[in-house]
Amino acid sequence: MDLETLNKIQEVEKDTGQSVLSIYSKVPFGNVVTAFREIPVSDLVDMVKSVPITKLVEGLQIITPNEISQIEVKKLKIVLKYGDMNNVAKLQEKFSERSIIIAISKISYRRLQELLERNNLDVMIDAINRNAFLNN
């Protein structure tokens, strides 16, 4: 891990009062490093403050490094905050990460939050199918 990543970790811990180093033992190393490299400190702080650590850990276990680096940070925060991680995992099993990245990039913030709050797996599958595979 490089010095810049360590400094970001320390800054997030200072700003949130929570230890994020505990995440390392529970989350694939590449996911954590990618998150700290790709996501600005202010957004990391917001994630740690707005998403329970257990849910954040679960989300970082499921979401891939490519998704972390390619999904817009605001949408990634929506997924972590409003998503049922069991359904997120099921979507990961059904679709390629590329399909998920494309679909999420096409869905508006509001629609993404609505889909996640509704928490209906079939509706989410339909949304990914419509957005990832059609030229719209």
Set out the residue ranges of the language-model regions:
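General marker for long, soluble alpha-helical cores
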Residues: 1-136
